[in-house]
Amino acid sequence: MMGFLNLYKPKGVTSHDVVDEVRRKLNIRRVGHAGTLDPFAEGVLVVGVGSTTRLLEYLQVERKRYYVKALLGVITETFDITGEIVEERECNIPDERIIDVVKSFVGKYKQVPPAYSAKKYKGERLYKLAREGKIISLPPVDVEIYGIDKIIVKKPHFSFEVEVSKGTYIRSLCMDIGYKLGCGATAKELKRLSVGTFDIRDAINPFEVGREKLLESLIDVQKVLPLPKVEIYKDFVENIYNGNQPTLDFVKEMVDSFSKDDDVMLICNGQLVAIAKAERNSKFLEKNLPRGRIFKLKKVFKEI
């Protein structure tokens, strides 16, 4: 059993709860997710099933889109409404100023990750350390805000949709907006609308569907992974399973072109056999000897 699932995580549950629900309904232990969503947040959560968990790192998820509603004049420990209130301030700022400040964050900027987050410090999750009273201040990281639109101001709230780079914390963005306004702000509602090509309009709630719906919703890894494909002969599949490095005589067809050092998918009869690193440019493979090694195996999959 292999494939990705485009799931909808409802409010009030953890990303791990979603994984557990999939494990229970599909009766499979090997399930993992890409990109944690906080319990108070909802929206798209990409899940890998079976050996697909080993492919989550190859997903093209550099861009994510969110809807967020923030509360003005409130600062919390966690940068969201679930945290303890640290400070409250009056906020009599004109709507136009709020809109201008929100828009000013489009582009690259250095962002400090929240102390309460799934980010790791010396192997430990920050939120676990914070709950133990160990507040870790991490250095700012470079993030990019690709665009902000649909800004609505209804004091004491304001909301907008935002497209961001991987690793951007929307809670931190709300805090930074509040800081620039001079009155503070905290995230009140958060919905992830998309992760790469995974869109909320296609997402399914694993708590509301059964096993059959989950199975029919599995997405073939080849439709999602942005890697070039190479078709290999069936006679050589067992060689790969035994750890033999692919040579030119393994290759049936170069489905896509690739460069040296690119990761490629080795497929046979429509099934993924392995992920391998190209040791030659596809343009020059014909110059190789039939038994000359052209790929180095990285991950092998035996579901074929």
Swiss-Prot record:
It comes from the Bacteria. Belongs to the pseudouridine synthase TruB family. Type 1 subfamily. One of its GO terms (molecular function) is tRNA pseudouridine(55) synthase activity. The active site is at 38 (nucleophile). The keyword NADP does not apply. It catalyses: uridine(55) in tRNA = pseudouridine(55) in tRNA. The gene is truB. This is tRNA pseudouridine synthase B. It comes from Thermosipho melanesiensis (strain DSM 12029 / CIP 104789 / BI429). Keywords: Isomerase, tRNA processing.
